[in-house]
């Protein structure tokens, strides 16, 4: 049995976008934001980007149903434009969320900032296999990243302690489609000759 919201549907509970996205990323609990009192003072910088939950709901429903969407998307280069997307995954780059989707306008997979989708409508009809996640080679390909303290850092042991390095290196795996986000999020110098300022780039991509 499958339940789909009608046009008149209104949620009983109100949830913050941060909470909903955390559930999608880490798994669902009991479905309630209990707002438990903190055991110790603990604060973070917060998130300035808050996607529209109705858009997120439409996107995730299309992902589960393997259907296409007609969206209005705001691009920095071309402004508002209509696109046909087949959403296949969500990706968090540390600052904002992206929708990984097959772009029918350009016949390729790409990332679309979730908060820049201002309108989304599910399209009738089936999608092709080449539009689904299994056909996304960049998503399927796993790359190895070997991170070391930037050679320009005066005290590399401090960086090793920050990241819990073993033998002076941190080895991680990433989807090829997301590797750029990893490099940007952690300000990793990926230049061959580690030429970026070590005061802002504590890590260097050795491989």
Where are these regions (language model features)?
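Bulky hydrophobic/aromatic content
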Residues: 5-74, 180-185, 189-206
């Amino acid at each position: 049995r499958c339940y789909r919201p009608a046009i008149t549907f209104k949620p009983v509970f109100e949830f913050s976008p941060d909470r909903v996205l955390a559930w999608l990323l880490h798994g669902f609990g009991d479905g309630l934001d209990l707002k438990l009192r903190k055991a110790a003072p603990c604060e973070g910088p917060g998130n300035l980007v808050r996607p529209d939950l109705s858009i997120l709901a439409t996107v995730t429903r299309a992902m589960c149903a393997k259907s296409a969407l007609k969206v209005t998307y705001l691009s920095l280069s071309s402004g508002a434009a209509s696109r046909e997307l087949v959403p296949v995954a969500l990706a968090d780059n540390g600052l904002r969320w992206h929708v990984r989707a097959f772009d029918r306008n350009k016949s390729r997979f790409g990332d679309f900032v979730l908060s820049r989708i201002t309108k989304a409508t599910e399209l009738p009809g089936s999608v092709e296999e080449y539009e689904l996640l299994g056909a996304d080679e960049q998503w399927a390909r796993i790359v190895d990243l070997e991170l070391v303290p930037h050679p320009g850092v005066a005290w590399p042991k401090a960086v090793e302690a920050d990241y819990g390095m073993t033998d002076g290196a941190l080895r991680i795996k990433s989807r090829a489609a997301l590797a750029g986000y990893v490099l940007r999020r952690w300000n990793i110098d990926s230049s061959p000759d580690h030429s970026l300022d070590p005061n802002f780039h504590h890590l260097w991509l050795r491989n």
